């Protein structure tokens, strides 16, 4: 078993608060609307969006080796636009990973947009290749899809 971590940054032209709300807090609702070829649906399994909430995202892409992801919110800071989540089911848990957590922070930038900083930590099961490059690409696609939606809908998530 191998432990690993990576960090990634994505610059977007949308304010940190709007990106945080859309890409993190409401992604289970927004994702299926803006990337239906990738996300079939989403829901809150338990909780109210605060720490301890469990959300499920159903994947609609045959290139992804799992059909859903369930994640638990471990930390949410609405003032600093931060969230930490842990994979609790699906998403390769037990097949690719022993465990995985992801920390997102949306930092305001001087141009009115923000810098999305992501740090992932995980334990890969024996014989499984580290696919962090694909994960980073997925994060970039997630943020850029959210950015495009918010730029096209300036009153959304205000």
UniProtKB/Swiss-Prot annotation:
Residue ranges that the Swiss-Prot or TrEMBL entry lists as coiled coil: none
Q: Report which superkingdom the organism of origin falls in.
A: Eukaryota
Give the subcellular location.
Cytoplasm
Write out the GO biological process terms: abscisic acid-activated signaling pathway; defense response
Under the heading Pfam families, the entry gives: Bet_v_1
GO MF term (any one): signaling receptor activity
Annotated Gene Ontology cellular components are: cytoplasm; nucleus
Question: What is its induction behaviour?
Answer: By wounding and elicitor treatments.
- InterPro entries cross-referenced by the UniProt entry: Bet_v_I/MLP (IPR000916), Bet_v_I_allergen (IPR024949), Plant_def-hormone_signal (IPR050279), START-like_dom_sf (IPR023393)
Q: Does the keyword Glycoprotein apply?
A: no
SUPFAM superfamilies membership:
Bet v1-like
Q: What is its main location?
A: cytoplasm
Supply the alphabetized keyword list: Cytoplasm, Pathogenesis-related protein, Plant defense
Describe the family membership recorded for this protein in Swiss-Prot or TrEMBL.
Belongs to the BetVI family.
Q: What is this protein called?
A: Pathogenesis-related protein 1
Q: Which organism is the protein's source?
A: Asparagus officinalis (Garden asparagus)
